[in-house]
């Protein structure tokens, strides 16, 4: 393969890899996506202690920052004071937490709306 074709082949391979990952995410359940992308930091079982992030059991509809014993950042407390975790707010949060509360501890971002929706739909059913 010539040197001029190698970058193109690499770019095509990378695009195919991204497309395959996107398709796999589209076919995964919200529970699977939660386990893959959220469970390392967040517990989901009722009464489980928080991990790196707060316990997300019953998060939909709960006031933001309402987990006893979890130390939210000052930025989080200021930006989300008086707000509850609606599906819409969770969607914005998962897309880019720093846009919702600049300086918050959470760094995870999910650009894919279908993945965010699947995770949020899963969280709606954890009560």
Named regions from a protein language model:
Residues 86:
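ATP phosphate-binding glycine-rich loop and adjacent ATP-lid/helix-beta elements
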Residues 1-10:
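Bacterial N-terminal signal peptides that target proteins for export
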Residues 18-21:
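N-terminal signal peptide c-region/cleavage motif recognized by signal peptidases
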Residues 108-113, 120-126:
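Short, exposed beta-strand-loop hairpins at the edges of beta-sheets
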Residues 26-82, 92-102, 126-127:
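Periplasmic/extracellular electron-transfer cofactor-ligation site
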Residues 11-13, 23, 28:
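Cleavable N-terminal signal peptides
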